[in-house]
């Protein structure tokens, strides 16, 4: 009887371990999917609003700007340590309604700089993730935008 109980418990543990969420995509694999569907780098992008954002890989975010305009934004700096756990972020730009290279993104008090911005074919990303049985990322809508005075202050 004891052997049967142990066997059943082992089977139950194995079943629980194998069920539930689909396997989590490795961050490098995840980033590769997004990079395959991203266009060439742009120096800056004009937007009306940043509707949503989510972290991708180790040091990138996707911004949904307006309706169905998505951009893969690669960051450099310490903020990437908090991207996965952040619920909000702040974009600090030198021009109103424009995000560009060298602008800042602040996550939990840590500042990163925008290294590159690339237009993203999100429908293709979504299709590839769904084909592989992967879940879509959780989107966050908490984005603060600050425009700093870019004037030189000179004569």
Spell out what each predicted region is.
Residues 1-9:
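Sec-dependent signal peptide recognition
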Residues 5, 50-52, 106:
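Residues embedded in well-ordered secondary-structure elements
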Residues 8, 57, 121:
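Residues that line or immediately flank small-molecule/substrate-binding pockets and catalytic motifs
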Residues 9, 43-46, 110:
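Extracytoplasmic/secreted proteins and extracellular or luminal domains
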Residues 12-15:
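C-terminal motif of bacterial Sec signal peptides marking the signal peptidase cleavage site
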Residues 17-77, 81-82, 140-152:
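N-terminal secretory signal peptides
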Residues 77-155:
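Helix-rich interaction surfaces within compact, conserved domain-sized segments
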């Amino acid at each position: 009887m004891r052997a049967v109980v142990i066997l059943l418990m082992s089977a139950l543990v194995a079943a629980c371990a194998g069920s539930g969420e689909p396997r989590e995509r490795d961050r490098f694999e995840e980033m590769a999917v997004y990079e395959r569907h991203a266009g060439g780098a742009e120096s800056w992008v004009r937007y009306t609003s940043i509707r949503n954002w989510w972290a991708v890989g180790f040091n990138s975010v996707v911004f949904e700007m307006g309706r169905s305009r998505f951009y893969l934004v690669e960051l450099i700096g310490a903020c990437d340590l908090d991207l996965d756990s952040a619920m909000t972020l702040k974009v600090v730009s030198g021009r109103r309604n424009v995000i560009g290279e060298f602008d800042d993104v602040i996550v939990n008090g840590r500042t990163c700089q925008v290294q590159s911005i690339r237009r993203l074919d999100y429908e293709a990303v979504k299709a590839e993730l769904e084909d592989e049985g992967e879940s879509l990322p959780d989107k966050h809508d908490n984005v603060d935008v600050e425009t700093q005075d870019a004037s030189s202050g000179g004569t």
